[in-house]
From Swiss-Prot:
Protein function: Snake venom phospholipase A2 (PLA2) that induces in vivo myotoxicity, moderates footpad edema, and causes in vitro neuromuscular blockade. PLA2 catalyzes the calcium-dependent hydrolysis of the 2-acyl groups in 3-sn-phosphoglycerides.
Name listed for the protein in its UniProt record: Basic phospholipase A2 Ph-TX1
Record keywords, A-Z: Calcium, Disulfide bond, Hydrolase, Lipid degradation, Lipid metabolism, Metal-binding, Myotoxin, Secreted, Toxin
Tissue-wise expression: Expressed by the venom gland.
Protein source organism: Bothrocophias hyoprora (Amazonian hognose viper)
Pfam families hit by this protein: Phospholip_A2_1 (PF00068)
Disulfide bonds: 28-45, 44-96, 50-123, 51-89, 59-83, 77-87
Active site feature: 48, 90
PROSITE patterns associated with the record: PA2_ASP, PA2_HIS
Length: 123
């Protein structure tokens, strides 16, 4: 769920997720293609896109909402939630953003997707 993912990012990084990551590089935000621009784009967004693509099995496509909570500043995805795997993908990306704040480059914010060429590596 995009809203829940945004809340995870905000709490992990202290950054507003939509302007900060909504159109960053070649993979952050809607759709993704081309060669990732840096560790934030590659390790976080590219891996997140691949994770969500691979984890769509048990979660209804019409409703990808999931439950989660915080325990000692750690995201805990709902154990019996049918969308738990998607929650885990979002959690991993939010933590990745925090761990890679130092690689964030403002020049890739609002990056034109037309500049993103064919991907060098598949999921």
């Amino acid at each position: 769920d995009l809203w829940e993912f945004g809340k995870m990012i905000l709490k992990e990084t202290g950054k507003n997720p939509f302007p900060y990551y909504g159109a960053y590089g070649c993979y952050c935000g809607w759709g993704g293609r081309g060669k990732p621009k840096d560790k934030t784009d590659d390790r976080c967004c590219f891996v997140h896109d691949c994770c969500r693509y691979k984890k769509l099995t048990g979660c209804p496509k019409t409703n990808d909402r999931y439950s989660y909570s915080w325990k000692d500043l750690t995201i805990v995805c709902g154990e019996d939630d049918p969308c738990k795997e998607l929650c885990e993908c979002d959690k991993a990306a939010a933590v990745c953003f925090r761990e890679n704040l130092g690689t964030y480059n403002k020049k890739y914010r609002y990056h034109l997707r037309s500049l993103c060429k064919k991907a060098d590596k598949p999921c």
